């Protein structure tokens, strides 16, 4: 199942040489794991609420590839260039299968709630 790394980054308005170095080198850490950028520094339109910063979305073939990339020695060596200069959060999330229908998930969760076995809102 396709997986995504999603980052919400703040304090990104004053890039420095470490940030440039990070940006120039990150793709080479993604390539061995099939990672590629879908969103990076694009214009952001707030529709509901206030978004705290920029958005980055990277796609991977699956969660194992995403974790493999993040835990890899080349990325771990590069990571401090970002964490020293940008604040934010990063999550991994699985995508949905082609043809996904949210009404099926609603029915499953409704049944779980009815049986008292569903404790959260995750799909």
Regions found by a protein language model. Name each.
Residues 64-99:
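A contiguous, mid-protein "functional segment" used to position or interact
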Residues 1-54, 61-68, 94-123:
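Short S/T/G/P-rich N-terminal loop/turn motif that feeds into the first structured element of a domain
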């Amino acid at each position: 199942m396709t997986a995504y790394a999603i980052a919400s980054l703040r304090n990104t308005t004053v890039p420095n040489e470490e940030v440039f170095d990070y940006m120039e080198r990150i793709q080479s850490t993604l390539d061995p794991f099939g990672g590629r950028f879908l969103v990076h520094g694009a214009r952001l339109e707030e529709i509901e609420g206030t978004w705290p910063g920029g958005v980055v979305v990277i796609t991977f073939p699956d969660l194992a590839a995403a974790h493999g990339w993040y835990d890899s020695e080349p990325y771990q060596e590069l990571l401090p260039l970002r964490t020293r200069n940008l604040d934010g959060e990063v999550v991994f999330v699985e995508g949905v299968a082609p043809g996904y229908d949210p009404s099926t998930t609603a029915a499953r969760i409704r049944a779980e709630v009815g049986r008292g076995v569903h404790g959260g809102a995750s799909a």
